[in-house]
Amino acid sequence: MKELQTVLKNHFAIEFADKKLLETAFTHTSYANEHRLLKISHNERLEFLGDAVLQLLISEYLYKKYPKKPEGDLSKLRAMIVREESLAGFARDCQFDQFIKLGKGEEKSGGRNRDTILGDAFEAFLGALLLDKDVAKVKEFIYQVMIPKVEAGEFEMITDYKTHLQELLQVNGDVAIRYQVISETGPAHDKVFDVEVLVEGKSIGQGQGRSKKLAEQEAAKNAVEKGLDSCI
C-alpha cells in the first residue's frame, strides 16, 4: 500500500489519515474470502457509498454544465460516464489496477484486467475518500481525473443500447420491454450473467456480461443489430 500512497500523494495530493480504510477500498472479495481467518474487510460497502457520491457529483456537474439539455439527455450522458467500462478506464488512468488485492484464483483468471473489478475498486476508493476527507475532496479528485475527458466529448459517442432500443420500439407508443436473467454461472465474486430482452413477452435478443447491467446492454445491442423487423 505504500506505493499506492505515493501515487496518491504525488499525482493527486491525497494523503489518507486512515490507511486501513484505503487498504479496504482496494481489497476484492476474493482476497478477503481466501483470508477469512484474518477477518479482512473487502470493498463492497465502500463501493456502495462511492457509487452514490459519484452519481451526485456527476449529476451536479452535468446540470450546471449543460443548462439547456433536457433531463433525458443528461441521464444518458451520466449513464455513459459512470458505466462500468468508463470507470475501469479511469481506474487504469490512476494506476489503481496495480494495487487491487485479489485472491489467487481471481488473479490467475485475469481479474486484474476485468472492468467489473476495476470499476468497483474505483467507486470504493471514492467512498473511502469521502469517509477519510469530505465530499469536497472527492469532487476535487473527480474534476481532476474524470471531467477533462467528459469535456473532451469522449462519452457523447458511446451508444446506450438499452435507451436506443427503447426509443426505437416506443416510437409509435408504449411497448412493454423487460430484461430477464436466463442464467448465472461462476463463483459469487465473478459471476457471468446471461440475459434476454423481451418485448410484449417475446424474446428479441440475448446478451452476456460480468454484471446484469452489462448483460442487459449486450442483449439490447443484439436486438438492435438484428433489426426491428425481426424483433416485433
Swiss-Prot record:
It comes from the Bacteria. It is found in: Cytoplasm. Mg(2+) binds at residues 47, 120, 123. Its main location: cytoplasm. GO terms for cellular component: cytoplasm. Its EC number is 3.1.26.3. Residues 5-134 form the RNase III domain. InterPro entries: dsRBD_dom, RNase_III, RNase_III_dom, RNase_III_sf. SMART domains: DSRM, RIBOc. One of its GO terms (molecular function) is metal ion binding. Keywords: Cytoplasm, Endonuclease, Hydrolase, Magnesium, Metal-binding, mRNA processing, Nuclease, RNA-binding, rRNA processing, rRNA-binding, tRNA processing. Its cofactor is Mg(2+). It catalyses: Endonucleolytic cleavage to 5'-phosphomonoester. The active site is at 51, 123. Residues 160-229 form the DRBM domain. GO terms for biological process: mRNA processing; regulation of gene expression; rRNA processing; tRNA processing. Homodimer. PANTHER family: RIBONUCLEASE 3, RIBONUCLEASE III. Belongs to the ribonuclease III family. Digests double-stranded RNA. Involved in the processing of primary rRNA transcript to yield the immediate precursors to the large and small rRNAs (23S and 16S). Processes some mRNAs, and tRNAs when they are encoded in the rRNA operon. Processes pre-crRNA and tracrRNA of type II CRISPR loci if present in the organism. This is Ribonuclease 3. The gene is rnc.
